[in-house]
Design a protein with these regions (language model features):
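Bateman (tandem CBS) regulatory domains
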Residues: 53-57
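DNA polymerase processivity clamps
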Residues: 1-43, 58-179
């Protein structure tokens, strides 16, 4: 189902408490509520096998307050967007802090340190698309997130720290080569 369709449906269902009936037909889906019929086309093609994308080994793990992290990335993205690639750099520091930075040749550099709750494993120097990271962070409820790294050029996984089932919701971010 296209993301835009799900977003619109979510807005319509914001306060709905009754059950929803779903019907699939050909390349369309129909959501039926008491006073609403919502049609959407389905995306064509086969969905990629994501189980191979999600890393199973972890070399480093970071626990950080999602709101503080999101705000730091948002501020760094203001400058990164000037360069059109929106690349944010993350580097772990020895004192339990994480440095979030970006630069734009025309404008300058920005760097901000954010305290982490914990960090274990190898030092991290990684770059990523700021918009993707902010979208991932906004999807979580709760205060803290756990980020698992399996290498500097391997995808990394974000999960809510205190989730009953840690695999219930996860976000996968692929790094950008800059270091």
């Amino acid at each position: 189902i296209p993301g835009k369709s799900l977003s619109e449906l979510n807005k319509l269902l914001d306060d709905a408490s009754e059950s929803i009936e779903m019907t699939l037909a050909n390349n369309q889906i129909l959501f039926k509520l008491k006073d609403l019929l919502f049609y959407s086309r389905l995306l064509e093609g086969s969905y990629p096998d994501t189980s191979r994308l999600i890393p199973t080994d972890t070399k480093s793990e970071l626990v950080i307050n999602s709101k503080a992290f999101l705000q730091a990335i948002d501020r760094a993205s203001l400058l990164a967007r000037e360069n059109r690639n929106n690349v944010i750099k993350l580097m772990t520091l020895e004192n339990g802090q994480v440095e979030v930075s970006s630069n734009s040749p025309e404008v300058g550099n920005v760097s901000e340190n954010v305290f982490s709750q914990s960090f274990t494993g190898e030092e991290i120097k990684i770059s990523f698309n700021g918009k993707y990271m902010m979208d991932a962070l906004r999807a979580f409820e709760g205060d803290d997130i756990q980020i698992s790294f399996s290498g500097t050029m391997r995808p990394f996984v974000l999960r809510p720290k205190d989730a009953a089932n840690p695999n219930e919701i996860l976000q996968l971010i692929t790094p950008v080569r800059t270091y």
